[in-house]
A protein has these predicted regions:
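Conserved SAM-binding loop
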Residues: 60-64, 69-176, 203
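Conserved hydrophobic residues forming the short capping helix/wall of the S-adenosyl-L-methionine
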Residues: 53, 57, 109, 210
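Acceptor-substrate binding/catalytic loop of class I
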Residues: 168, 188-205
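Conserved alpha-helix/loop element of class I SAM-dependent methyltransferases that forms part
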Residues: 40-67
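Short alpha-helix
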Residues: 197-214, 220
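Alpha-helical membrane-targeting segments
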Residues: 172-194
C-alpha cells in the first residue's frame, strides 16, 4: 500500500478494501481469473464512456475521438479502463490506493507502449495542479470509507463544464443475490468478501451526495 500518513486520507481509504484488492492484483489482466466479470463487462463500459464524452464535448473526430481530453481514472486497479481510454487518445492520469495495483498497471501499460501517468494516491491527496475534463469513478464508491468526502474531493479535480462518471452497485435484493451470493458464493467468480452489501448505494442517495457537491446529474442508467 502507499505510505500515506495524513489523517484526512484515512477518511476515504479503507485499508481492508485495499488489502483485499492488493492480494488479487496479479490477476487483473487474466481474462479467465478473478476479474473475468469485469473483462466481460469492459467493452460495454468503454463504449458507454466514449459515446457520452463525444456527445458532452460535441466531438466530431472519429479517429482517436478523445484526443487531448484530460482524463482521471480513480481506483484504476490494473488499468482495465485506463488503457482503452489512452488508446482512444485521452491523456490519462490513473490513481489507486494500492501500490501493487499501480505496479501491475504500470508494467502492463509499458509493455503495450502506452503513456499513462499512474500514481499511488487518492483524490484528496493527489499532488497535481491540473484539473480534468473527464473523471471516472467506476465501481469504486462502494469500496471507500467516506463517500461524501470522497466525491467532494473528486469534484475539486473536475474542470468547469467537465463530466464525471460514477458507477456502483444498486442497493437492492437483486444486487445481493447476483453480486454477492451468485458471483462470490455460487459461481466463485470473485473471492468471498469482495463486496459488502451495506456499502452498496441506492441511486437517490448517490444523486443526493452529488447535488450536495454542486454536480448536475445528467443521466442515471442501469
Amino acid at each position: 500500500n502507499c505510505n500515506i500518513n495524513n489523517q484526512s486520507i484515512m477518511s476515504t481509504i479503507n485499508k481492508k478494501e485495499i488489502e483485499k484488492f492488493s492480494k488479487m492484483a496479479d490477476e487483473w489482466w487474466d481474462t479467465e481469473g478473478k476479474f473475468k466479470p469485469l473483462h466481460k463487462f469492459n467493452p460495454l463500459r468503454i463504449s458507454y464512456i466514449k459515446n457520452k464524452v463525444i456527445n458532452h464535448f460535441n466531438i466530431k473526430s472519429k479517429f482517436m475521438p478523445l484526443k487531448n481530453i484530460e482524463l482521471l481514472d480513480i481506483g484504476c486497479g490494473g488499468g482495465l479502463l485506463s488503457e482503452p481510454m489512452c488508446r482512444l487518445g485521452a491523456k490519462v492520469t490513473a490513481i489507486d490506493a494500492s501500490q501493487k495495483n499501480i505496479d501491475v498497471a504500470s508494467f502492463h501499460s509499458k509493455k503495450n507502449k502506452l503513456n499513462i501517468n499512474y500514481l499511488c494516491t487518492s483524490p484528496e491527496k493527489i499532488n497535481i495542479k491540473k484539473k480534468f475534463d473527464v473523471i471516472l469513478n467506476m465501481e469504486i464508491v462502494e469500496h471507500v470509507e467516506d463517500i461524501d468526502f470522497f466525491l467532494k474531493s473528486c469534484t475539486k479535480l473536475l474542470k468547469k463544464g467537465g463530466i464525471m462518471f460514477v458507477a456502483t452497485l444498486n442497493k437492492t435484493l437483486k444486487s445481493y443475490v447476483f453480486a454477492i451470493v451468485g458471483a462470490e458464493y455460487i459461481l466463485r467468480w470473485l473471492p468471498i468478501g469482495t463486496h459488502e452489501w451495506e456499502k452498496f448505494l441506492k441511486p437517490e442517495d448517490l444523486i443526493s451526495i452529488q447535488k450536495k457537491n454542486k454536480l448536475i446529474v445528467e443521466k442515471v442508467d442501469g
